Amino acid sequence: MSKSRIIRDVCSLLEGQLAIMQAAATEARHNATGEETRSEGKYDTRAIEASYLAGAQSAQAENIAAAIGILKVFEPLPCQEEEPVRSGTLVEAEHEGTIIFYLLAPDGGGSTVEHEGFDCTVLTPESSLYQSLLGAHLGDLLEDSSLLILGVS
């Protein structure tokens, strides 16, 4: 499976999350302005709380939409095994006997999809593991995470 396929799978995953978040934000907006949240006294804050929730959910939906947009135009360069890990690299690693793949990408961090029967997790620059992997080479052992790099592409 190519990196472009992983990115497409991550975009599909995020699009599903976006649909759920947009529906939740719409419902929260309705709850904030609906008859059922009309204030019944000066200490009744249901409408205010619902409006805060609607705002936060709308912001989260915008973040997910932005991530999808960034990933759809992201074209990672090929990486040879002798090259150091950089943005766009697909890293195969072993951690305590478990094989896992990481794709270093500009957005979509934390998303996990299947790659060759294993989990592939997207790491972004905000991640400490992303920062630890940058510049590492095939065969390196990352001391702080006990992660052995088995392959890069």
Label every model-predicted segment.
Residues Q80-L147, S153:
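Non-DNA-binding regulatory cores of transcription-related proteins
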Residues G55, A59-I99:
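Long amphipathic N-terminal alpha/beta scaffold segment
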Residues M1, I7, R29, E36, ...:
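Mixed-charge, polar/low-complexity N-terminal
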Residues M1-A67:
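Helix-rich terminal scaffold detector
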